Curated annotation (Swiss-Prot):
Residues 344-558 are annotated as: B. The keyword Nucleotide-binding applies. This is Chaperone protein HtpG. It comes from Polaromonas sp. (strain JS666 / ATCC BAA-500). The gene is htpG. Keywords: ATP-binding, Chaperone, Cytoplasm, Nucleotide-binding, Stress response. Residues 559-626 are annotated as: C. Residues 1-343 are annotated as: A.
Length: 626
């Protein structure tokens, strides 16, 4: 019999040591992971058999079996799923994709409860068996291969593993755990059933164990439970989403969510519905409590699994949920899609379009319910996902108004991100005809923005927007409930009825009186500024930068450049406060050019930018200080 002794990939050896010695605070999780893997193997067989029914080999009743042997001190988990070839055993059990391993190691936090969830997330749940076993033997045969091409894989979880050919009549995989002495309590039907009930009850396949019955002891010996030859199903053996809501406990929903999302926390909100009509489907969707580390990766795999008539089709059905709701986890089971549906067909299917729209409406309803009825949960949701929700303004025209009502911001009157557009409108001053906002790289920068000075002086509230996506998103939202949105850093400030006639007259006089200085500033800054003008929006600051209505803001331009995108050159407008001592100093004419460039660069710094030539800026400032 051909036998190979091979070494684990270095990262696997490191992972094994971590798993067996420090990672799991709850060793019961090993059974959840191995049953989940067995279920996945059956899903894969069912999927491949759609095109080749011969893979069933006359046995289409897929199941998972648990058997324990107290004499041999073993626990065996067997499935009749897709199975492994010899090559797959070596590749899947002896190596992990290096990038995945690095990511896994990098994400470990030291919190055992959270780290345990990462095992399944990174596809290494098999190794959790070494928590309770000092040796694992895997016997398998891939569907479609002859009985002579079975494979036996064995390892003690150290540096090496053995692989050999074997004769195996049945298709599928058996994982034999040779239990450690301190893990003998897993040779107990009551213990195993309790774990299955807690972690794997929702698995749609039947999980079978041998029945036990009480046998009285003889000759004064105590009685004991003994295994019969009969098998019984020990789980519900029905996909959770197919059961009636009234029959499912909140704890069962939470455990199902944790299983499919690899999250250690319960979800923030859950919705479970059967949709009937033109398109029939069941949706079981969850909003997580915490955002994943890769939330802002728009190319990440979606979190919704697609089933067709309870047959698993794919893990990351991106067509079922818009990108801005990529944080949603769950399951959609359709009755209308073909079993051999492809990703390409998903993009074109009218049924999928209806499902996507239905999922979007349902998720937005969940969020609206939190906003209306649970302020604490909505605050927690918005802190985690508010930024990506804003992406929907540019992606989902049909739901733009609903999304706008859910957005929250800090403002010049409150530091907490709690002000909605409706709240702002309710507090608008008499005569105010716009919703004013300012964008910046940080909340602190927004609060200290010089463009806010006239608004503070007049007691006009301004929304403070500090998410990277804000500037982009607001290009798609020009008004709220009939009231226009106006950036205080775009265009000439026009407070309309809120500005009295004396102020307007003073501004016109300043523009006329100061025209010679403005013309000189324009000439000195012709390579930097599109225009230079006097302004009434400044009270304490000497100058600020604004852009013309319709132009890209300097903040958005910086963000796009950082993302590696080509950005057209947009020169800002320099607005100066004619009443400020530094600006009046320009009239003396001394060091005019240096002062002009300092004014511009300081205005750029005030809004979070950086002078084009920092060394030249420092040199000019130093020259004026001596």
């Amino acid at each position: 019999m051909h036998k190979q002794t091979l070494s684990f990939q270095a990262e696997v050896a490191q992972l094994l040591n971590l798993v067996t010695h420090s990672l799991y605070s709850n060793p019961d999780i090993f059974l959840r992971e191995l049953i989940s893997n067995a279920s996945d193997a059956c899903d894969k067989l069912r999927f491949e058999a759609l095109n080749d029914a011969a893979l069933y080999e006359g046995d289409s009743e897929l199941q998972v079996r648990l058997r324990y042997n107290k004499t041999a001190n073993t626990l065996t988990i067997t499935d009749n799923g897709i199975g492994l070839s010899e090559r797959e055993a070596i590749e899947n059990l002896g190596t992990i994709a290096k990038s995945g391993t690095r990511d896994f190691m990098a994400k470990l936090s030291g919190d055992q409860k959270n780290d345990a969830q990462l095992i399944g997330q990174f596809g290494v749940g098999f190794y959790s068996g070494f928590i309770v076993a000092d040796r694992i033997t895997v016997e398998s045969r891939r569907a479609g291969l002859p009985a002579t091409q079975g494979v036996r894989w064995s390892s003690e979880g150290t540096g090496e593993f053995e692989v050999s050919e074997m004769e195996r009549a049945e298709r599928g995989t058996s994982i034999i755990l040779h239990l450690k002495d301190d893990a003998r309590d897993y040779l107990n039907a009551w213990k195993l059933k309790g774990i299955i009930n807690k972690y794997s009850d929702h698995i749609s396949l039947p999980i079978l164990m041998q029945k036990e019955e009480w046998k009285e002891g003889e000759n004064g010996q105590p009685g004991e439970m003994v295994v019969t030859g009969e098998w019984e199903t020990v789980n519900q053996a029905a996909a959770l989403w197919t059961r009636a809501k009234k029959d499912i406990t909140p704890e069962q929903y939470d455990e199902f969510y944790k299983q499919i999302s690899y999250d250690s926390q319960a979800p923030l909100a859950t919705t479970h519905n059967r949709v009937e009509g033109g398109t029939e489907y069941t949706q079981l969707l969850f909003i997580p409590a915490k955002a994943p580390m890769d939330l802002f990766n728009r190319d990440k795999a979606a979190g919704v699994k697609l089933y067709v008539r309870r047959v698993f089709i794919m893990d990351d059905a991106q067509a079922l949920m818009p990108t801005y709701l990529r944080f949603v986890k769950g399951v959609v089971d359709s009755a209308d899609l073909p079993l051999n549906v492809s990703r390409e067909l998903l993009q074109e299917s009218r049924a999928v379009k209806a499902i996507r729209e239905g999922n979007t409406r349902r998720v937005l309803s969940m969020i609206e319910d939190l906003a209306a009825n649970d302020a604490d949960k909505f605050k927690a949701f918005y802190a985690e996902f508010g930024a990506v929700l804003k992406e929907g303004l540019g992606e989902d025209f049909a739901n733009r108004e609903r999304l706008a009502k859910l957005l929250r911001f800090a403002s010049s009157t409150t530091d907490t991100v709690s002000v909605g557009f409706a709240d702002y409108k309710a507090r608008m001053k008499e005569g105010q005809d716009a919703i004013y906002y300012v964008t910046a790289d940080t909340l602190a920068a927004a609060k200290s923005s010089p463009q806010l000075e006239i608004f503070r002086k007049k007691g006009i509230e301004v929304l403070l927007m500090a998410d990277r996506v804000d500037e982009w998103a607001l290009n798609y939202l020009h008004e709220f409930d009939g009231t226009p949105l106006q950036s205080v850093a775009k265009g000439a400030v026009d407070l309309g009825k809120l500005q009295d006639e004396d102020e307007k007259k003073a501004a016109e006089e300043a523009q006329t009186h100061f025209k010679p200085i403005l013309d000189k500033l324009k000439e000195a800054l012709k390579d930097k500024a599109k225009d230079v003008r006097a302004t009434t929006r400044l009270v304490d600051s000497p100058a600020c930068l604004v852009v013309q209505d319709g132009d890209m803001s300097t903040q958005l331009a910086r963000m796009l450049k950082q993302a590696g995108q080509a950005v057209p050159e947009v020169k800002p407008i320099l607005e100066v406060n004619a009443q400020h001592p530094l600006v009046k100093k320009l009239e003396a004419g001394e060091h005019f050019d240096d002062l002009a460039h300092i004014l511009f660069d300081q205005a750029l710094l005030a809004e979070g930018g950086m002078p084009e030539d920092p060394a030249a800026y420092v040199k000019r400032v130093n020259a004026l200080l001596v």
